[in-house]
Amino acid sequence: MDSRLLEIIACPRCQGRLQLDKENERLICRFEHIAFPIVQGIPVLLVEEAVSLAEDPKDIT
């Protein structure tokens, strides 16, 4: 994912900064404790598609 894109996109729920998790192909919002999938290189920034980090075994600490 382009680092410039990562600097301008934000969490759709809280508008917080997102962190890239390359290994699991997702963007993480540490404020809301949710992750958004990246599908074929495109971030899916829909709250309905987000996965709770509390329930996800791939959570990175």
From Swiss-Prot:
<dbReference type="InterPro" id="IPR005651">
    <property type="entry name" value="Trm112-like"/>
</dbReference>
<dbReference type="GO" id="GO:0005829">
    <property type="term" value="C:cytosol"/>
</dbReference>
<dbReference type="Pfam" id="PF03966">
    <property type="entry name" value="Trm112p"/>
</dbReference>
<comment type="similarity">
    <text>Belongs to the UPF0434 family.</text>
</comment>
<protein>
    <recommendedName>
        <fullName>UPF0434 protein MS0934</fullName>
    </recommendedName>
</protein>
